[in-house]
A protein has these predicted regions:
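Active-site-proximal loop/turn and secondary-structure-junction residues that shape catalytic pockets
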Residues: 92, 241-243, 251, 290-292, ...
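Short glycine/acidic-rich loop motifs that flank beta-strands on beta-rich extracellular proteins
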Residues: 83, 94-98, 117-118, 159-163, ...
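Short, surface-exposed basic-aromatic patches at helix termini and helix-loop junctions that form
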Residues: 98-107, 240, 327, 355-356
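Residue-level marker of regulatory loop/turn positions in helix-turn-helix DNA-binding domains and
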Residues: 206-208, 216, 239, 266, ...
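Short, small-residue-enriched loops and turns at beta-alpha junctions
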Residues: 60-62, 293-297, 327-328
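Right-handed parallel beta-helix
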Residues: 110-111, 146-154, 220-230, 243-255, ...
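Extracellular beta-rich repeat passengers
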Residues: 325, 345-473
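Extracellular "leader-to-stem" segments immediately downstream of a signal peptide or signal-anchor
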Residues: 2-87, 92-105, 109-218, 223-225, ...
Length: 473
C-alpha cells in the first residue's frame, strides 16, 4: 500500500504536461525553464512569406503520375526568389527523391500524402555526395542548408516494405505471404526475405544501399512540425552533423517488426529541441548517435538537447544513447516523457570500438509501462568481432587504441514504471566500468528481475524501490 501511495504522489508531483503544438510557433524559450543544466536554446528558422503551390508547376496528386519534376521546379522557383513556402494541397503524390534548399518551407496541407516510389533506379546518388556512405539518395534530403522546414498536417510515406529485408520469425503467415507476393528472394534457409533488387544487382546488395526517409546533412536552423513520417526504408528522421534543430508535434511510425526503422536519430548534432512528439517504430525510438571511432570524435559531441513531452510506444528503446558514442554526449535533458510497450525504457548502450563520454545527462519525470526488457539499462558490451576475439583470447586491450565507452554523470530521477522484465541493469566491462550514475525517486513495480550490476561503481540509489524493496548494490 505504501508503494502504491508513493507512486501516486510521484505521478501527481511530476505529471506530464503534453502541450499542444502551436502552428508557426517561433518562441520556444518556455520549454527551457527550470533546467538542471544550462542548455543552448533553439530558435525557429526564418522563412520569407513568398508562397507557391506544387500544382502550379504541374503536380497532379493523383497517386499515379510521378510528380518529382513538379516538386523540384517549385523548390527551384522559390529558391530563385530568395526563399518561401512550397505548398502541397490535399492529394496523393507519387515521388522520387526531392532535395530541399535554403530558406524553404515544404508545407503539407491536411490530407496531403507523399508516397515515395519503390523504384530504386530513381535514387542513384549524386557524384561525390557527402555523408552517404555510398547509399542511395534519401526520399527527402538537404545538404549544407540554412533555414529549412517541413510543416503542416500531411503524411510522408517511404514505402519501406519494398526496401527492407524481413525476418520470417517476426512475421505472421499472412504478412509473410504478402511480402513474398511483392517479388523478391527468400534465402535458402527460409529465414529472410529480400525485396526485389534492380537488374544486375545481387538480392542482398539493396540492403546495403537503402537510405533514410528524411536525411538532413550539415544544416542549420531546421524545423519539422506537425507532419507524420512513416514506413521508412531505414531510419525515419535523421539530422546528421546539424545545428539548431526543432521537432515539434511530429509523428513517426512504422510496423513494429520493420528492420532498422529507427524513429528519430541525432548524429553529432548540437542545439536540438524535440517536443510533443509521438514515436511508434521498429527500432530505437529517439536515439542519440555520436559517431564511431575517429570520425565520431572529430565530429564532436551530441550536445544541448532537450526532449520534452514525448510519447514512445513500440521501439527498441524509448530514449537511447548509442551504440555509437565516440564523439561524446553532453548536456542532454529528457523530461516529462512516456514509454509504453517499448522493449527498453531508458537505454544506454555502447562498446569498446565506439565508446565516448557522457556528461550532464538528465532524465527526469519518466513514466513507463509494459516494458518488455529493462526499464533502465547501461551496457558496455556492444563490441565488434575483432574486439570480441581479443577479449575471448585474454588479450590485454590497449585503452589508448580503442574507443572505450564512458557512461558517467547521468542522473535519473522521478521515474515510475509498472511492468518490466528487469528493473535496472548495469553491465560494464573490466576495461570500462559504469560509474557515477545517480538514481533518485525511482519506483519500478512488477519487474520479474529487480536489479543487476556488474563492473559498476559510484552508483547512487536515493529513494529507489523495485518491487517494493531497495536494490542491494
Amino acid at each position: 500500500m505504501k508503494l502504491k501511495r508513493t507512486a501516486i504522489l510521484l505521478l501527481l508531483a511530476c505529471g506530464i504536461s503534453m502541450q499542444a503544438s502551436a502552428a508557426g510557433q517561433n518562441d520556444y524559450s518556455s520549454y527551457y525553464t527550470n533546467m538542471p543544466v544550462q542548455l543552448a536554446q533553439v530558435s525557429a528558422p526564418s522563412i520569407p512569406d513568398y508562397r507557391v503551390s506544387v500544382r502550379d508547376f504541374g503536380a497532379k496528386g493523383d497517386g499515379v503520375t510521378l510528380d518529382t519534376e513538379a516538386f523540384t521546379k517549385a523548390i527551384d522557383a522559390v529558391e530563385a526568389k530568395g526563399g518561401g513556402h512550397v505548398d502541397v494541397p490535399a492529394g496523393v503524390y507519387l515521388l522520387g527523391p526531392i532535395e530541399l534548399k535554403s530558406h524553404i518551407d515544404l508545407h503539407l496541407d491536411d490530407n496531403a500524402t507523399l508516397y515515395f516510389s519503390p523504384d530504386a533506379g530513381l535514387y542513384e546518388q549524386k557524384e561525390n555526395a557527402k555523408g552517404t556512405r555510398g547509399r542511395l539518395r534519401s526520399a527527402i534530403s538537404a545538404e549544407r542548408c540554412i533555414d529549412i522546414s517541413i510543416t503542416g498536417r500531411g503524411l510522408i510515406d517511404g514505402m519501406g516494405n519494398y526496401w527492407r529485408p524481413v525476418k520470417r520469425s517476426k512475421q505472421s503467415d499472412e504478412e509473410w505471404k504478402t511480402y513474398v507476393k511483392q517479388g523478391g528472394t527468400v534465402t535458402k534457409d527460409g529465414n529472410f526475405f529480400f525485396p526485389k533488387a534492380p537488374e544486375g544487382m545481387e538480392y542482398d546488395a539493396l540492403e546495403k544501399l537503402r537510405n533514410d526517409l528524411i536525411r538532413i546533412y550539415r544544416c542549420k536552423n531546421v524545423l519539422l512540425q506537425g507532419v507524420t513520417f512513416q514506413n521508412s526504408p531505414r531510419f525515419h528522421v535523421h539530422p546528421y552533423y546539424c545545428e539548431n534543430v526543432i521537432m515539434d508535434g511530429i509523428v513517426v511510425r512504422s510496423p513494429w517488426n520493420a528492420q532498422n526503422a529507427d524513429g528519430i536519430d541525432l548524429t553529432n548534432c548540437r542545439r536540438v529541441l524535440i517536443v510533443n512528439t509521438t514515436v511508434d517504430t521498429g527500432d530505437d525510438g529517439i536515439c542519440m548517435k555520436g559517431g564511431q571511432g575517429e570520425s565520431g570524435r572529430k565530429a564532436g559531441p551530441v550536445s544541448d538537447v532537450l526532449i520534452k513531452n514525448c510519447r514512445v510506444y513500440h521501439a527498441h528503446g524509448g530514449f537511447t544513447i548509442g551504440s555509437d558514442c565516440s564523439g561524446g554526449m553532453r548536456n542532454i535533458v529528457v523530461r516529462n516523457c512516456t514509454y509504453n510497450g517499448t522493449d527498453v525504457g531508458l537505454r544506454f548502450k555502447s562498446g569498446m570500438d565506439r565508446g565516448g563520454k557522457t556528461e550532464n545527462v538528465y532524465c527526469d519525470s519518466i513514466f513507463m509501462s509494459n516494458i518488455k526488457g529493462e526499464a533502465i539499462i547501461f551496457e558496455n558490451t556492444y563490441v565488434n568481432k575483432d574486439v570480441k576475439f581479443m577479449l575471448g583470447n585474454g588479450t590485454d586491450i590497449d585503452s589508448t587504441k580503442v574507443f572505450l565507452p564512458d557512461f558517467t554523470d547521468v542522473h535519473i530521477s522521478n521515474v515510475v514504471c509498472r511492468g518490466a522484465e528487469t528493473g535496472i541493469l548495469l553491465r560494464g566491462i573490466p576495461q570500462a566500468f559504469i560509474h557515477d550514475i545517480s538514481f533518485r525517486n525511482v519506483i519500478i513495480s512488477e519487474a520479474r528481475k529487480p536489479y543487476s550490476s556488474e563492473y559498476a561503481k559510484g552508483i547512487v540509489l536515493d529513494n529507489v524501490l523495485v518491487n517494493g524493496e531497495k536494490p542491494k548494490l
